[in-house]
Amino acid sequence: MPAAIDKDENIQKEGKRIELVKDSPKQFAASGAAAVSAQPNSDKLADVSPLHAERTVAQAQEASVSSFNEEEVIHDLQHYLPSQAPLKDFIHHNTLHAFQNYPFHEGTRRAKKIFGYFPSLQLREYRDLYEAGRIRKDILERVISEQKGAQHLEDWMQRLLEKEYDDSVSPRIGKLRANWKRHYPIDLDLMVHPLLFRILCSYLDQGISIWGFPIGHKGFLAALKEMEEKSFASFFKTKRAKKLLVSGNCKMADLLKLLVGDETLYAQYLFDQQFAHPGWSGMVASVEAQPASLLNPKNITVHDLVVFELLLEIDALDSYFGESWEPIAHILEERPEPLFADVPETEVDTVFSLWHDAFEWTYYDQVLTGIALQDKTWERKIENRSFQTYFCIDDRLTSFRRYLEQLDPDCETFTTAGFFNVELYYQPENGKFYTKCCPAPVFPKFLVKEIGNKQKIKKEVHFSKLTHSLFQGWFISQTIGFVSALRLALNVFKPGSMPAGASSYTHVDKNATLTIENKDPNDKENGLQIGFTIDEMVQRVQGVLTSTGLNGVDKTFAPIVYMIGHGASSVNNPHYTAYDCGACGGRPGSVNARTFCYMANHPKVREALKERGIIIPPTTQFLPGLHDTTRDEVAFFDEEILSEENAGKHRRNTLVINEALDLHAKERSRRLVSIDTKMSPKEIHEEIRRRSVSLFEPRPELNHATNAVSIIGRRSITENLFLDRRASTSTYDYRTDPEGKFLTMSMGPIALVMGGIDLEYFFSRTDNHKMGAGTKLPHNVMGLIGVANGADGDLRTGLPSQMIEIHDPVRLLVIIEHYPDVALKVIKSQTANYSFYENYWVHCLALHPDTGELWLYKDGSFSKIYKPLLNDLETVSDLSALMERAKKAESIETLDAVQENLPVYFIEKKERVKK
């Protein structure tokens, strides 16, 4: 996930860019036909008055002054291109981050009209949802009345429900460059892209190819130039393009003069060109911005990519027409509309925004009704805590917490960002590279190294490089190859683990030690401090414990406090890092959990914490664990540190945890068509495990599909609500943090991590063709950096359809339990993330701790009290029965998928008896 956009910087840059593109049409219009030919036509000037001719010549001369700013255009391209990192660092982010400096509906409208994205459901789908009751009439009427006035309610209801609209998209992007095909009988993309993509893939390859790219240590363009000079074969079919590259006379402006001919069209042409393959262009931009994202470093820039593609286009045209073809400006019949000209709101845009707001608030209203009707004074009282667990804020873990509390009423659960406030780089033993284990925008100063890894790396003979050689490859295919085919067939009926699988448990060896403590600040490696000093440990442990209200005074410690990170296992899944912990940079949370527990168990850290008002009893021990969310299994680390008494308690706690995992697997199974939810929890859990290692299962788990809400507050707010695993929760106790100091820490990952997750699912769901990756079935892994359809396709960005089919595209609703003025101060202090709230890319409410009022963020402040329209929610007493009778989606049509999501329920409060 990229760092959040700096609003002021982007507005300034946007302003410069808009000024450029708005000036260009003026120059074009002023010079008339001269702008097309780039030279004033004196014969035509003779037909006009002397005054007009003088003015026209002056304007033509003004237009001849260069209006093309190469650096500015490249910068703009980098801003608007997809910012998806290579597969090993795939982390969710706002797909339309480039428009985040606009209010949500305006930004999505611009993205739709400029780039052809479809950022909402179809009009037919909204109307179907309304007919099915999934968009409530009272909510729709409230939305219309608030935005258009109550006096216009009937008129707008008629428009939304009955009027026919043309909701097709005719984007501005590509219209200039489309004139090649319109004027000449050629498909320039078809002639250029296959070769371009293969060269890019070969150059950026991270380990698939047996032969590395020749001269790969040089920059992209420099390497191509040297290869062209020293090779018998050529990248080009004609002499001119080759000569331009080899001679070094390939300045971008000169090449554009040959291809375009009019400087005022250069920028638009480059946008058309690069957005014909946004996947590869975006990958190049991402690698240029973060070279360390490639383990096999490559020096490539968007500038070099553009120059080489321009050369290939010149070569393609020369091969077809010789050198007699005209620049595109000379063959224009009609000048295209400037790409970034203003995008006025039309009636159909308003209709879409009203429908979508009503769709969102129909769900939000249920959640807020549940919160508003809660007993504000109720909080579960626990006299003798059996154990306490910390989980990540991840929405997939909310039901796991619920089952733990149901099975053991004396346990207590907390949530915090899954990196547990310890930002670090991690280096496995014998590893060449550092792995960042913290949110993507954070750049740690600390390095934790693994020592004593005794894991044996599984090997597979079919992965041998010999399989690619002529004779050995033939021999292996004719012998071991048959065994491989049999194993593949067997996997259909009896899935099992294999070396090709990705398992979160291999992230760190269970028996290895970590260099967590730093006793000498000068102990550094590559500028990174190895381990943490005592003071640094104290700060991080205090932050987590204080923000969650666990300080040993107001709330006492249990004998064992589990810090459980999360990861995932999968087979044949290129997007595997998207299933791991986003707060850990797309890595499992095991290293962070072990690091935090070491800190919290350190005697000197506890002494310092005691001076700060946090009293941890000597009998309390912190124990790290890792939850595999695909298999629903938990593994523990460092169990040998437990005292004899706590070891016995840990064994009893493990029984509770395993039973909770069985129940959790049953709840998950209601969305998995291949599993009968009426089976016993243990039988279902076994089926879940088999799915996780099946080569033929495109949906081993549904990851964050259906996520919609993020709640920052005490557990009592949500403990008696059934939210269908759609809410991420961050434990925060305002009573221990009246000024909001630690709320800032809790809010840090909300917009960036959870908001990014929500928005990527949102846009991959509404337009899976352009903003998503399409179906997984034709995907090929390209160079270990991305996936493409077939061998010569563009890289696919966003999420595959199998991850988003059941997702409701709604913005994240953030609910903060604190006084509105404190909540406002905190979100405004986070300048890097504030645009999420300011421009409504996420919704935000403050839950007043004293009155229970829900204050909605609007126009820069929490100035409006939201009053839910529902008076009550249905109460459910048996969740297992609810899961068994819940409807499974019959198709991936929006109406079917949405109806699979259960409404919000109250969970009947029962007298809990510990088993």
UniProtKB/Swiss-Prot annotation:
Zn(2+) binds at residues 392, 394, 566, 581. It is found in: Cell inner membrane. Keywords: Cell inner membrane, Cell membrane, Membrane, Metal-binding, Transport, Zinc. The lineage of its organism: Bacteria, Pseudomonadati, Pseudomonadota, Betaproteobacteria, Nitrosomonadales. It comes from Nitrosospira multiformis (strain ATCC 25196 / NCIMB 11849 / C 71). Forms a complex with DabB. Belongs to the inorganic carbon transporter (TC 9.A.2) DabA family. The keyword Iron does not apply. The keyword Transmembrane helix does not apply. Part of an energy-coupled inorganic carbon pump. This is Probable inorganic carbon transporter subunit DabA. Pfam families: DabA. One of its GO terms (cellular component) is plasma membrane. HAMAP family: DabA. It is a peripheral membrane protein. InterPro entries: DabA. Its cofactor is Zn(2+). GO terms for molecular function: zinc ion binding. It comes from the Bacteria.
